[in-house]
Amino acid sequence: MKNINAIILLSSLTSASVFAGAYVENREAYNLASDQGEVMLRVGYNFDMGAGIMLTNTYTFQREDELKHGYNEIEGWYPLFKPTDKLTIQPGGLINDKSIGSGGAVYLDVNYKFTPWFNLTVRNRFNHNNYSSTDLNGDLDNNDSYEIGNYWNFIITDKFSYTFEPHYFYNINDFNSGNGTKHHWEITNTFRYRINEHWLPYIELRWLDRNVEPYHREQNQIRIGTKYFF
């Protein structure tokens, strides 16, 4: 009965991959195509009713390069509508800043808990850059995109969980993605292990579609991180 209760608790929280309260997070990533690494530092707070906020800071590096600042970001979400104990509709948004300029995104999540051990979130998101880039026609425009994401959350045991996360991106204006087309996929497999009430380490195996310029190879990325809950 203790394990069943723990699984039910995890199921109610895995849709946002969070536990109530404040936390800090550290994550390191490595892209096998670009040979680029990334270090992420994050602080956040999750409220009991499901709302949350987090602040993120990243740095990138190559093997022989110095650490360079990536971006700063603040993100928040709120469970606006919950018609049943299984269905939740949750809007969210974020703003970010990096050396080339600022941007942001708004999204709407729809989560449904099918069983105590499986729930699915479908996300519709619009990504916007406040700065202009040169498009395929040589004109300056905003490289904005529309994104559809799915989060297939599985509770394997009271400590171990897995998320399958495919995302589809479509460039709204005349820009191509790294694969040479107006659209691309990013697929993430996340494995988490809950050590205790404080520590939650995880590993992510990601495929970021094929890059045709300048790497001419599949973009595979490995992320290793941990969260500490207070």
UniProtKB/Swiss-Prot annotation:
It is found in: Cell outer membrane. Residues 1-20 form the signal peptide. Transmembrane segments: none annotated. Its main location: membrane. One of its GO terms (molecular function) is porin activity. Keywords: Cell outer membrane, Ion transport, Membrane, Porin, Signal, Sugar transport, Transmembrane, Transmembrane beta strand, Transport. It is a multi-pass membrane protein. This is Porin OmpL. The gene is ompL.
